Amino acid sequence: MSTKRRKTSDEPSALKKAAAPSAPELKKEKKVKDKSTKDKSSTKKTEKTEKKQDAPEPAEESTPATNSTEEDSVTLDVAPEQEEVETVKKTFKDLGIVDALCEACERLGYKNPTPIQEQSIPLALQNRDIIGIAETGSGKTAAFALPILQALLDKPAPLFALVLAPTRELAAQIAQAFEALGSLISLRCALILGGMDMVTQAIALGKKPHVIVATPGRLLDHLEKTKGFSLRSMQYLVMDEADRLLDMDFGPILEKILKFLPRERRTFLFSATMSSKVESLQRASLRDPLKVSVSSNKYATVSTLKSNYVFIPHMHKDTYLVYLCNEFAGQTIIIFTRTVLETQRIAILLRTLGMGAIPLHGGLSQSARLGALNKFRAGSREILVATDVAARGLDIPNVDCVINHDLPQDSKTYVHRVGRTARAGKSGHAISIVTQYDLEIWLRIEAALGHKLDEYPLEKDEVMVFKPRVEEAQRHARNEMKSLMENQGKHGGLLKRKRGNGQGGGRDHMDAEEG
C-alpha cells in the first residue's frame, strides 16, 4: 500500500482526525426478558400450593454470527430458576471500535464479531495483555488488528506494532488484512519475509511504517544487521499461531527478538492450542495477561463442518480421489498430501484429467507459492493440492471441501487441515481417504475428536468407472514427474531452496515451512 508523505516523521492527517476514545464504553450484551406473570385477581392459597408454576418458554434463538461450537464454550449456563436471557448480536461498534474502523469492517463484509473478537477486543481496548485460544478460521487476525489500529488512531506513531507469524504465507495474509482494515486511515504496513531482498526490505523499514508483519528469522536478521533499524519505541507485539512458532523451533529466535523490544508494551499471543511451550513463552513475554478461550476442547471442529471417511484398498486411492473431485465438481477443493512429490504428482494427475488443479508446497519458490494461492483464491483454479504448508493460518475463503488423500500423522494436524473449510460460520465438507495401512492413525484421530465419523456414502461400481482413465493419467503423471525430476536435478533438485541474497540465508529456510 503506497501512501504519499511529506516527511517520514509526520503522521497522516487521517490518523489524527479519527482519533479513538481512550476508554470506549461497552454496551450491554444481553437483554433480559421479564416473563414472570402476575395474577390480576387473588386466588386461593390451596390452588397455589397444589399447582406447579408453568415452565418458562424457551428464549428465542438469534442466528449466530459465527459457528455455535465456539459460542458454547464461552457462554455461561443459565440455571432453570433464573430469568431467561436473549442473546443479542453485537456489532463492532458495540465492542468500542470507532466509526472509521467499523466502516472498514463493513467494506470487508465483517457484519458481526466472531466469538474470539467479541471476547478479546474489549479487553485489548483496556490496554491488557491477552492470550487468545481459538480454532482456526475464528477471526483471530481482526481480533488483534482492530485494537492496534484503534490505538494507533489515538496516538499516531511510527513503528507502532510488530506482528510475528510462523510462515511467509500467513505473514502476507496478515499484512493484507492490516492494509484492508487500515485503508481509510492511511496505514503504512511493511512485510518482512525470508527469501526476499534484504536491501529492499531495509528501505521499507527506513520509511518508518506503522505496522511490521514479519517471519522471525528475517526480522532478527534486520535487527542485527540493518543500520538504524530499532524497535525500542514499539508499543504492540503480536505472536500469531504461537504454538506453530514454537513447533518450528523458533523459540531461540523469539528469545533474541524479545531482547530488542521495550518491556513497556502490550503483547497479544494467539494460538490454536495451549501447550507447555506456549505457556513458557507466555511467562517470558506477557505481563498479567487475560486468557480468552473459545475452544471447546483441544481437538474441536466447528459445528458447520460435515466430516466423513471412505475406507478403501490402498491401490485404488487415486481412483477414489478422482471420483470425489468429480462429485464436488464446480466447487473449491483442497487436497492434502503428505509429501512434496505426491503433491506434484496428484496435481499433474488431475490436470491430465481436465481438472483445474495447482500444487502448493514448501519446495516452490515464494513467488510461485503466492501465485498458486492467488489463482486459487481468484477462482482460476478450483483445486489446490497441498502439503501441510496450507493447513494452518491461511485465510482461503469459500473452500467447499477438504479431501485428505494422505492422512496426517497426528490429530492436531487433522483439525487444522479440515479447518480450511467451514470457516466463519459457513458450511463445509471434509472427507478422509483411509486405507488398510491407515487404521491405527484413523482410530487415534477419532479418539481425539471424541466420536466416530460416518462413512461417506458411495457405490463402488460408480467409482470403478473412472479406473481406466485414472490409470492412463497415472502413467502420464509418472512420466512427467520423471522428466521434472531430471530437469530439477540439474539445478539442485526439486526440494532444494535457493538462498536469498546471501544475508540471513541460514534462517530463511525456517519460515519457508517444510513440505
UniProtKB/Swiss-Prot annotation:
Pfam families named among the record's database cross-references: DEAD (PF00270), Helicase_C (PF00271)
Domain spans labelled Helicase C-terminal: 316-464
EC number of the protein: 3.6.4.-
Biased composition (Basic and acidic residues): 25-55, 506-515
Main localisation: nucleus
Keywords, ordered alphabetically: ATP-binding, Helicase, Hydrolase, Nucleotide-binding, Nucleus, Ribosome biogenesis, RNA-binding, rRNA processing
GO-annotated biological processes: rRNA processing
Record flagged with keyword Disulfide bond: no
Record's compositionally biased regions (Acidic residues): 69-85
CDD domains, per database record: DEADc_DDX47, SF2_C_DEAD
Enzyme class: hydrolase
Record's subcellular location: Nucleus
Any Gene Ontology CC annotation: nucleus
Function: Required for pre-ribosomal RNA processing. Involved in the maturation of the 35S-pre-rRNA and to its cleavage to mature 18S rRNA.
Domain notes for this protein: The Q motif is unique to and characteristic of the DEAD box family of RNA helicases and controls ATP binding and hydrolysis.
Descriptive protein name: ATP-dependent rRNA helicase rrp-3
Organism: Neurospora crassa (strain ATCC 24698 / 74-OR23-1A / CBS 708.71 / DSM 1257 / FGSC 987)
